[in-house]
């Protein structure tokens, strides 16, 4: 099985991915919903780490360290580092930020490997408003590091207020390379091949035509 389809299948079985009628924070009525917060077991995080690792290897990106934005990005960075070692024999360091600066003990807002003047991959689940990514970029640039790429689980490929998706807004800002494990196009292809899910095709295509980029 193609690993992208494997990821969608895994997400659907875990009820992380659902098809139906859902109101998003934006107010839009969506024919699908993706909730990565339901991935909360040891097996879940092992699998997620492997999906990110596969995506990183396939991208052929050159990088030195993984960075996980607090809070959801932290376990993703750890799991991906483990997967890269276990499956590709790459001993990749990781780093993450804390949301509260500490003046005592392990001072500062960074934990883990140094990112100073390193090539950094940012790992997050889904870019919605982009707040966590914006904050991460500031932290990384403060360390005189460069952003090799940003990896996310899902790109909804939707227009925002700027007529661009949040992801494409980032791409246009500084030509950041943003790679998603799956997109709405992958979801539609998956549903087309599943007889039990084909009823959702009209709504998915209509939604993509209305809000897609």
Curated annotation (Swiss-Prot):
Name of the gene this protein is made from: pyrE
GO biological process, one term: 'de novo' pyrimidine nucleobase biosynthetic process
Lineage, top ranks: Bacteria, Pseudomonadati, Pseudomonadota, Gammaproteobacteria, Enterobacterales
GO terms for MF: magnesium ion binding; orotate phosphoribosyltransferase activity
Residues bound to 5-phospho-alpha-D-ribose 1-diphosphate: 25, 71-72, 98-99, 102, 104, 124-132
Catalytic activity: orotidine 5'-phosphate + diphosphate = orotate + 5-phospho-alpha-D-ribose 1-diphosphate
Residues that hold orotate according to the record: 33-34, 128, 156
Stated name of the protein: Orotate phosphoribosyltransferase
EC class: transferase
Keywords, ordered alphabetically: Glycosyltransferase, Magnesium, Pyrimidine biosynthesis, Transferase
């Amino acid at each position: 099985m193609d690993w992208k389809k494997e990821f969608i299948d895994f997400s659907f079985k875990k009820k992380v991915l659902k098809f139906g009628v859902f109101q998003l924070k934006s107010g839009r009525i969506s024919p699908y919903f993706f909730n990565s917060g339901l991935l909360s077991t040891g097996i879940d995080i092992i699998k997620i780490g492997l999906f990110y690792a596969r995506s990183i290897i396939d991208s052929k990106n050159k990088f030195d360290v993984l960075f996980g934005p607090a809070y959801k990005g932290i376990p993703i960075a750890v799991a991906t580092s483990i997967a890269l070692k276990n499956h590709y024999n790459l001993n990749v360091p990781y780093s993450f930020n804390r949301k509260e600066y500490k003046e005592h003990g392990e001072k500062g807002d960074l934990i883990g490997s140094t990112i100073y003047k390193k090539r950094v991959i940012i790992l997050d689940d889904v870019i919605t408003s982009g707040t966590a990514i914006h904050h991460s970029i500031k932290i990384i640039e403060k360390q005189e590091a460069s952003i090799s790429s940003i990896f996310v689980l899902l790109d909804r490929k939707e227009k925002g207020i700027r007529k661009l998706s949040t992801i494409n807004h980032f791409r246009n800002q500084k030509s950041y390379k943003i790679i998603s494990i799956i997109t709405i196009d992958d979801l539609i292809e998956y549903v087309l091949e599943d007889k039990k899910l084909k009823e959702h095709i009209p709504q998915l295509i209509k939604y993509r035509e209305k809000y897609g980029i």
